Amino acid sequence: FVKAMDLSSEKSRAEFFAALSSRGEKVKMLINVAGADIQKAFEEYTQEKLLFQCRANFEGAAAMCLYAVQHAAKKAKIINISSVSGIYPMPYFAVYSATKGALTSFSLSLSREVKKRGITVTAILPGAMPTREDVRKQIREQKAWGKLAAEPPSVVARKSLRAAEKGKRKVIVGFWNKLMNAATKLLPLSLKMKFIEKRWSKISKDAF
C-alpha cells in the first residue's frame, strides 16, 4: 500500500487517514521524518510560508501521531525525527528551531501518556543530514564544523530504529552533537544566541 500525501495539508491528511481506515489495519510503526528546513530572517517570511513550515514540521507530525495512537497495534512504535536545532533558540532559524523544539517536547509528553498501552514514542535529534544538494553544499561550506555535526540518513535511520527497539524517549545522534549539547549547557543563553546569530545570519535558504 503506497499513497502520496502532503503532510502540511489537512485535506491531504484526511484522505490518507480515510484510505488507511478502509483497510482496517492497525499501526505497528510510524516514522515522522518529513520537514521543511527554511532558514532566513523571520521578517522575510510570508504568512503562507510561515504556516507551511509550522504545519510540515509540527502539525502534520502531531496529526499522524494522533491517528497512530488511536489505531495502534500492541507494542506499536512511533519515531519522530526532530533536530538538535530545537534544543535552544536559534536566531535566523527561528521557525525551524521552534517547530522542532515543539516536536521534541510533544514526543516526550506523548511517550508518557501512551506508555501504559505499551506504545513507544522516540524523539530523534540529529544534526544536519546530507539529503538535498543545497544541504550537502551548506555542509561542505561549513568545513570541519559541518562534517562533525552531520550524519548520513542511513546512520540516522539505523540509530532511530535501534533507539525505538530499546524504548528510549530521546536520542541525540552523533558524538559531536552530544558533546556540543553538553558543553553549551554551561554557557549563558545570551552568549549561545550571539554565537548562533553570527553563524546563521550569513545563510539564507528556502527550497520550498
Name each region found by the language model.
Residues 116-175:
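SDR active-site lid
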Residues 43, 90-94:
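Active-site loop immediately N-terminal to the catalytic Tyr-X3-Lys motif
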Residues 83:
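Residue(s) in the substrate-gating loop at a strand-loop-helix junction
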Residues 71-72, 88, 109-120:
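Active-site-adjacent segment of SDR/Rossmann-fold oxidoreductases
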